[in-house]
Each structure stands twice: as C-alpha cells, then as structure tokens.
Amino acid sequence: MEELVSVILAAGLGKRMKSKYPKVVHKVCGKPMVKWVVEAAQEAGSKEVIVVVGHGREMVEEVLGDEVKYAYQKVQLGTGHAVMMAEEFLPLEGMVLILTGDTPLITSDTLRKLVEYHISEGNDVTILSSIFDDPTGYGRIIRDESGNVVKIVEEKDASEEEKRVKEINSGMYVVDIAKLRAALKEITNDNAQGEYYLTDAVEIIRNMGGKIGAVVGESEEIIGVNSRVQLSNAEKVMRRRINEKHMENGVTIIDPDSTYIDAEVEIGRDTVILPGTILQGKTKIGEDCEIGPNSRIVDSTIGNGCNVMYSVVLSSSVGNNVKIGPFAHIRPESVIKNNVKIGDFVEIKKSVIDEGSKVPHLTYVGDAELGKNVNMGCGSITVNYDGKQKHKTIIGDNVFVGCNVNLVAPVKIGNNAYIAAGSTITEDVPEGALAIARSRQTNKEGWVEERIKKGRL
C-alpha cells in the first residue's frame, strides 16, 4: 500500500463558540476535539499527522504535544490555503487524508473504508460524503447518470435542482499527493471571499483527467462542531458510544442517559454504574464495584469490590473492598487502603488511611497518616492549619479516637492508644495510653429550682 499521511485543518477560531480558546481544543467526553481526529487518523494507518494551526496555536500544540507535526497558517485564507501551508511536510508521492479538526465523531473504521475504497477504485480523489435529510448549508456532491462524481458545488452556487441533492460534502478527502501538489499550484482566490478553496483543487484534478469518487459515511460522524449547541450534541453521541463500549465489555450501566464517562476511563467487568455518576479523566475502576448514584470520580484509581455512593473522589487511590459515602469527599493525594470505611459527611484531604480503618461519619482528616484498624469517632477532626502552615497528624495502629476529639497538629498518637471523647489533644500520646484532655464535670444540685425562685428562669 502507498504511504498514507494526514493533514488536519485546525487553524480556525470558531467565532460561534464565543470563546477565548480555539474551537478544536474544546473537549468532548474529556478529550479535545482535535485529539479525537488525530487518533482516528493514526488508527486508520497514517504514518504521519500534520496539523495546520493558526488561532491559539500554542494551546493546540500543548494539547497534542510532539506526536504530530505543525504547519502554521498565519492568516486564514480558506481550506485550500491551509493545505498549502502543510505542503512542505508532505512526501513526494503517496496518499494524504485531509480532515477537519472540528469533527470529533469521525471514526477510524470510516477512514479505513475511505482509504480502502480510494485504493480499490484507483481514484485520485475520494470524497467522504453523507446523506442528509436537510442538507442546507453544505456543498452538494453532483453525480452523473452512472453514479460517477462530476463535481462539488457549494450551496450558494447551486441551482435549484442541485440544492435538492441530499448527498453532501463532509470536507474530508483522500487525495493522491502528486496530483494535489499540481492542483495547489493552479487554484486561485478569485471569488467573493478572496479565499483558496480545496474544492477548487478537486475540480482542477478532475479537469486534469483525474478520477474522482465518493464514499457515503454515517451522517453523525461528519457533523462539524461550530457552536456550543453542536458541542453538546457531539458530547451526547460520544457518551453513548463510550457507555455502549463499557456495557459490551461487561459493565452494567443502569441508566446510560444519566451516566457521564470520559474517553480514557477504565472499568472492570461486573461493576455496576448507577444513575447520576460522572467518571472523568484517567479514572480506573476495578471489578465488582458499585459506583453511584450521584457520585463523581476524577483521575482516581478504585480497587475491586468497592462502593462509592453520593460521594466525590479526586486524584486519589482507593484499595479493594472500600466503602465510601454517602456524602463523603476524598480530596487530591489521598490514599485509602483495603477494607476501609469512609462514611457520611467525611472529608479526607491529602491523607493515608491504612487497612481496616474506619472513619464513619462527620469527620475531617487532613494531612494525616492513620494506621491499621483505627476508629475515628463521630465529630473527630485533625486540626492541621495554624493560620500559616499545614501540620501533620500521625496515628498508629489499633487506635480508638472518641467522639468530638480535636487532634491539634503536629501530633503523634502511639499504637493501641485510646483518646477519650471530647478531648483536645495538643501533645503526643504514648503507645497503649488513654489520653483525656477535657474539663472535669461538675453537677450543681438544685440549681434550676433556685434560679426559678429568683425569677431568672
């Protein structure tokens, strides 16, 4: 097979997005639009990908890194001009796949079929087209009586008969590189917009005796994203694809329409995802878990057999057989080890909770290390901030912390120690000790009756 390279047009600003960011870096299911297109091209067999950048080039380059080459279109003078900017990176011969960076729904399967058809038919240009019930706004593919592609006509230039054609041009092509180079030398900007159109290059190749063909693709794949509404539509389609992929791999998703899973999330088999769940970033969920309802997990690892209910987990690691929630908040850089319980209205911040420990309810643990089999009583907190710096609390194994305890950091609690309820601990507690730091109770008998007599109650 001839060498295949790709050129992705990603220089436009996207005015209808009404954004300070270039259109193609807006995300669909957690991944920038242009990255979806790059990956589709690579999976379709492209040996090299050239991305034409313009507005916000630094942001596009930051998103894609060094996995692609960049051509710079300083002034946006049309699709043909954009391809001209990439010409220096093209090999002398072979095939070039020309794509647009705002079509995140295009799949590698469709691109492979496009390339295979191009080769099998011996075409010089093969257009990816689609059939739209309402083709308004798109260029039309005009065929002769034998079904051969005659031309692409823009809607503004189409006759009434041509406007009734429902086969539209997606703006994506496979082109013979040698023929493309020759055509680019011939195209002009002699039009109302003063731009160089790639469709003119297609017409020039045809007039040079080149063979033009078209492959009809799925309409949802070629829809470009030019507005926030179209972005949300693309997100909906991609979300459906992602959810279906997980279900095909053995994950139960109770209500796919209310479940939001990013592109790079991994989920083990026999895990159940309940409604209202949001899984983002590079999150990894193990097997036999139950996630949700109404939970959000971002860039975190969750082990096997875990339950996360009505809770948020951010950039943290969770072991096996851990119960989280309802209404818990696991903040970044936390490590929750195996068989731990994090209960309702608990916040864990940048802390390690070792195996078998329980933080059942109404507790704040920040900048702390909890040993194995620790029990944190209701309302106990680590007092980690002195107004300027954060300090560490270290709790040993098998420690029992009573209710409403303040552990004022920096402080260490030895193994097997007990902390009496209501205590404010400001000094280290030795191993095996009982620490009590509270006022002694005083009962004043008859106090109420006396106050009543004096009219004070």
Swiss-Prot record:
Pathway(s) where this gene product acts: Nucleotide-sugar biosynthesis; UDP-N-acetyl-alpha-D-glucosamine biosynthesis; N-acetyl-alpha-D-glucosamine 1-phosphate from alpha-D-glucosamine 6-phosphate (route II): step 2/2; Nucleotide-sugar biosynthesis; UDP-N-acetyl-alpha-D-glucosamine biosynthesis; UDP-N-acetyl-alpha-D-glucosamine from N-acetyl-alpha-D-glucosamine 1-phosphate: step 1/1; Bacterial outer membrane biogenesis; LPS lipid A biosynthesis
Binding locations of acetyl-CoA: N384, Y385, A421, R438
GO biological process: cell morphogenesis; cell wall organization; lipid A biosynthetic process; peptidoglycan biosynthetic process; regulation of cell shape; UDP-N-acetylglucosamine biosynthetic process
Entry annotation: catalytic residues: H361 (proton acceptor)
Location of region: Pyrophosphorylase: 1-228
Linker as annotated region, ranges: 229-249
Residue stretches spanning the membrane: none
Catalytic reactions of this protein: alpha-D-glucosamine 1-phosphate + acetyl-CoA = N-acetyl-alpha-D-glucosamine 1-phosphate + CoA + H(+); N-acetyl-alpha-D-glucosamine 1-phosphate + UTP + H(+) = UDP-N-acetyl-alpha-D-glucosamine + diphosphate
Region of interest (N-acetyltransferase), residue spans: 250-457
SUPFAM superfamilies from the UniProt entry: Nucleotide-diphospho-sugar transferases (SSF53448), Trimeric LpxA-like enzymes (SSF51161)
Enzyme type, top EC level: transferase
Main location: cytoplasm
Cofactor binding comment, as recorded: Binds 1 Mg(2+) ion per subunit.
Entry binding sites for UDP-N-acetyl-alpha-D-glucosamine: 9-12, 23, 73, 78-79, 139, 154, 169, 226, 331, 349, 364, 375
Amino acids binding Mg(2+): D102, N226
Gene Ontology CC annotations of this record: cytoplasm; membrane
Superkingdom, natural source: Bacteria
Subcellular location: Cytoplasm
GO MF annotations in UniProt: glucosamine-1-phosphate N-acetyltransferase activity; magnesium ion binding; UDP-N-acetylglucosamine diphosphorylase activity
UniProt entry keywords in alphabetical sequence: Acyltransferase, Cell shape, Cell wall biogenesis/degradation, Cytoplasm, Magnesium, Metal-binding, Multifunctional enzyme, Nucleotidyltransferase, Peptidoglycan synthesis, Repeat, Transferase
Required cofactor names: Mg(2+)
Assembly behavior: Homotrimer.
Similarity comment: family membership: In the N-terminal section; belongs to the N-acetylglucosamine-1-phosphate uridyltransferase family.
Function description: Catalyzes the last two sequential reactions in the de novo biosynthetic pathway for UDP-N-acetylglucosamine (UDP-GlcNAc). The C-terminal domain catalyzes the transfer of acetyl group from acetyl coenzyme A to glucosamine-1-phosphate (GlcN-1-P) to produce N-acetylglucosamine-1-phosphate (GlcNAc-1-P), which is converted into UDP-GlcNAc by the transfer of uridine 5-monophosphate (from uridine 5-triphosphate), a reaction catalyzed by the N-terminal domain.
NCBIfam families documented for this protein: glmU (TIGR01173), PRK14354.1 (NF010934)
UniProt name for this protein: Bifunctional protein GlmU
Species assigned in the record: Caldanaerobacter subterraneus subsp. tengcongensis (strain DSM 15242 / JCM 11007 / NBRC 100824 / MB4) (Thermoanaerobacter tengcongensis)
Protein's gene: glmU
